[in-house]
Amino acid sequence: MYRIYDCLANQHDIVLVIIALLIGLAGIHTAFNMYARACIGRLRQKVAWLFLTGVVTGGSIWATHFIAMLSYDPVVPVGYEPVLTAVSLLIAIAATTAGFAIASVIGPNLLLSRIVGGLVVGLGISAMHFTGMSAIRVPGVISWHMDIVIGAILMGAVFGMISLWLARSAQTERQKLLGKAN
């Protein structure tokens, strides 16, 4: 645990970390509001809102992650392989779109759909993270601590499930308000 704290406290530009955090929070707020629209209306509207929710969610998660990566100072020159970097963005968008779709379309009132949808989001974010990290090019070797890798994947899965549960559970009042506005 100290390795993670030390890395964050001493090897990251705090201003960029704060910017990344603000982008993440704005993205989540926007995504939850868009997801509320995806849960009401006709099928064609739902599909469009789910796609847009996935693009906004995946894009903001990716931007948060990439800005945080840029804030890291490993004290050696760093580059990023463009194809893997772009693939990591596509993974984030695809996973969040699929996760939100599963949570809303398969059965919006079923606990299982929220859990599976959240699991897809969480594991997709983990895949985006490790794909993005694989895009890093440095004059040296990057090594992975498997305990941290496994912990990150498990945390991503759990937080994904919690996030989708909260996003869907919070829809009741928003749906009423949005329904009145339509």
Where are these regions (language model features)?
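Alpha-helical transmembrane segments and their helix-helix packing motifs
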Residues: 1-182
